[in-house]
């Protein structure tokens, strides 16, 4: 079960019994249970306008933006949530995934901001690991993928020895996260395949 699903169960119970429940919030919960995240966003934006900086609303709004593929708004919403609750693991997780999705978007191929999105995603996953512990397989996997994608991005322009060395370092960081994950979840073929891929890329850079 992912971080949002773990936390949302408590919010569902709370919203159905606590004084926090409001019309827009209740409608958003019903929509999310049906997988209708567009309606959820509409209702949560109204709730956010009425009760600014409510952590429960922001958590659900950020997740709904993510599910709708609106990654820019997802990032800004989770940034607001982190300013209120700095140790909210799910906020770093989904903000990191949103940043990585933006960085990997073909539409961003000419954007000078791509590198910033890669490094920011890695920082988010690293912060989440600091909070949740270094045996968090979900975070290790996503940071490993972020290192890999960032290394691929940098390798396209790597001409000089120092640039190639920097790419190798990123691929090695990816391998380290994947190998740590394998000690916790052995025989993950997808992870074994990614390690093989990383090693092949390192060989091509030498």
Where are these predicted regions, by residue range?
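Conserved structural position within tetratricopeptide repeats
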Residues: 46-49, 79-83, 123-131, 176, ...
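Short coil/turn linking the two alpha-helices of tandem helical-hairpin repeats
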Residues: 69, 96, 101-111, 144, ...
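Short coil turns that delineate tetratricopeptide repeat
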Residues: 52, 86, 133-134, 186
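Helix-start (N-cap) detector for alpha-helical repeat units in TPR-like alpha-solenoids
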Residues: 24, 55-56, 89-90, 135-138, ...
């Amino acid at each position: 079960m992912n971080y949002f699903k773990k936390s949302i169960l408590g919010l569902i119970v709370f919203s159905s019994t606590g004084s926090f429940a409001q019309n827009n919030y209740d409608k958003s919960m019903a929509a999310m249970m049906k997988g209708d995240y567009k309606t959820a966003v509409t209702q949560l934006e109204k709730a956010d306008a009425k009760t600014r900086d409510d952590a429960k609303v922001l958590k659900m709004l950020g997740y709904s933006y993510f599910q709708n593929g609106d990654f820019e708004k997802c990032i800004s919403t989770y940034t607001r949530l982190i300013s209120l609750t700095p140790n909210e693991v799910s906020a770093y997780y989904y903000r990191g995934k949103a940043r990585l999705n933006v960085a990997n978007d073909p539409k961003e191929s000419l954007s000078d901001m791509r590198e910033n999105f890669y490094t920011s995603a890695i920082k988010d996953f690293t912060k989440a690991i600091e909070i949740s512990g270094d045996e968090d397989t979900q975070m290790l996997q996503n940071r490993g993928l972020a290192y890999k994608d960032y290394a691929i991005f940098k390798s396209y322009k790597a001409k000089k020895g120092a640039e190639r060395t920097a790419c190798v370092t990123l691929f090695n960081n990816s391998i380290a996260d994947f190998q740590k994950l394998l000690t916790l979840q052995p025989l993950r073929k997808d992870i074994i395949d990614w390690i093989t891929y990383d090693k092949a890329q390192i060989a091509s850079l030498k």
